[in-house]
Amino acid sequence: MEAKEKKYGEIEIEKAQLEAWPNPNPERDYMIEITFPEFTCLCPRSGYPDFATIKIRYIPDKYIVELKSLKLWLNKFRNRYISHEAATNEIYQALYDLLKPRFLEVVGDFHPRGNVHTVVRVRSDENYG
């Protein structure tokens, strides 16, 4: 069996790290909305793929996320066994830790599976307890 050589995209995804860039207008409150419609991960119970649209909304303070780094970093989830809740919370926490925004919301809108549609929402301004 011949060894499979990794494609350049696989290599970029493997080494992907989130990058913060300086906010060009830190004196102003403005909302950035990012939609990632092709999010995938693996169900930790069955191993079947889960598909979702990840929606990110934030009001930056000193930093904004560099979009290519975000895209590649989100693609790292595609071969991970992780629940909807854990994936959405991990995305939220990584962005919050990196950017320290004035406001952040991450929504994981997962495609129905077994006739169940799950939406996980994490916001910096809400206490759901």
UniProtKB/Swiss-Prot annotation:
- One annotated GO molecular function: preQ1 synthase activity
Q: Give the matching Pfam families.
A: QueF (PF14489)
| UniProt EC number | 1.7.1.13
Q: Which organism is it from?
A: Aquifex aeolicus (strain VF5)
Q: Name its pathway.
A: tRNA modification; tRNA-queuosine biosynthesis
Q: Which HAMAP family match?
A: QueF_type1
What positions does the entry give for substrate binding?
A: V65, E66, L67, H84, E85
Q: What is its main location?
A: cytoplasm
Query: Which family does this protein fall into?
Result: Belongs to the GTP cyclohydrolase I family. QueF type 1 subfamily.
Described by its record, this protein's role is as follows: Catalyzes the NADPH-dependent reduction of 7-cyano-7-deazaguanine (preQ0) to 7-aminomethyl-7-deazaguanine (preQ1).
Report the subcellular localization: Cytoplasm
**Name of protein:** NADPH-dependent 7-cyano-7-deazaguanine reductase
Can you list the GO cellular component terms from the UniProt entry? cytosol
Reaction equations catalysed:
7-aminomethyl-7-carbaguanine + 2 NADP(+) = 7-cyano-7-deazaguanine + 2 NADPH + 3 H(+)
The active-site annotation reads C43, D50
Its keywords, alphabetically, are:
Cytoplasm, NADP, Oxidoreductase, Queuosine biosynthesis
Highest taxon of the source?
A: Bacteria
GO biological process, alphabetically ordered: queuosine biosynthetic process; tRNA modification
